[in-house]
Amino acid sequence: MSQYFNADMRRLRRACAGILFFAASGAWAGQYPANPVRMIVPYPPGGPTDIAARLAADELGRSLGVSVVVENKSGAGGMVGADMVARARPDGATLLVNASAHVIYPAIFKQVSFDVIDSFTPVTQLVQVPLALLVPVSLPVNNVPELIQYIKDHPGKVAFASAGNGGAPHLAAELFKKEAGVDILHVPYKGSAPALTDLMGGQVQMMFDSMTSSLAYVKAGKLNALAVTTPERSSMLPDVPTMKEAGLPSYALTNWYGLWAPKGMPAPLVKQIEQALNAKFHTPEIREKLNAIGAEPVISSPEDFARFVVTEKERWGRIAQDSGATLN
């Protein structure tokens, strides 16, 4: 266990102690104190993180009786928007919805203007977004063991695509390389769309990607999904095995979106938000909307999310470090 993980755990214990203290105090009961509320999404409009955030904003606004406005502040892989929230007042008026990229920043960027744990108050994990191991239908493999054997039988001739260097799909493939004991060329693209196009055309032989981008192609028979990266099978592709079931017992990764507030936001406000979302996000209507973008609802407690973020930072950081992926 690394010294960074131990330091993160010490900060986590302090944060959880604050959450429990304020929760016991009963402060901020009743009306939510901020109106309107800005929900910052550090990516352009229309993407899966943005769509999930807008669903959360709508439900949160209705539950709290306030206006929740989504603002897209993209740049530097999401760090521009995250930095805005890190610098905001912890009064409930500014929130952040970010993907698992939030905990990858320290591993792939040499300079990060905030601490991904200590500069924020964790509120809840909103959703998980399973990644699928995809191959073109023309590739003569039907499962993960056959893919591994194909790679070994064709040294230097198998390449994997990603939506960009350092993202969750890229690092998922790097973990696959390590666990399977194979070497594959990385071909990064500017987004999932061109990568999936080349994958379907056979220009690259495999790709890990979120179901947000790839589910429609799998269901249309244009791509084969050999496995999902989550510990359990996905309800969206129930017949597709997990990586563990497919023969890699140590492999488990989840892409996810979470909700944060600036550091120091009182725990009763945090709990008010979490409870409001928990009451709405598991309804059949919201689940259907999330499934349409390849996501599954979670809504964890602030304490559980705080622990989850620490372990995810360690997990993704280790994968990034092993792969040598950097962006500046």
Segments (PLM) and residue ranges:
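Hinge/capping helix and adjacent helix->loop/strand transition within the periplasmic-binding protein
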Residues: 87-93, 108-194, 243, 256-289
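N-terminal signal peptide c-region/cleavage motif recognized by signal peptidases
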Residues: 24-28
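Bacterial N-terminal signal peptides that target proteins for export
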Residues: 3-16
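Short hydrophobic alpha-helices and adjacent helix-cap/hinge residues
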Residues: 4-6, 29-31, 35, 59-65, ...
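N-terminal (or domain-start) structured segment
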Residues: 29-118, 157, 165, 181-210, ...
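Beta->alpha turn/N-cap motifs
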Residues: 97-102, 162, 172, 192, ...
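A ligand-binding cleft/hinge motif common to bilobed small-molecule-binding domains
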Residues: 102-111, 170, 177-179, 206-240, ...
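An extracytoplasmic/periplasmic, membrane-proximal ligand-sensing/linker region
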Residues: 34-36, 178-182, 219, 245, ...
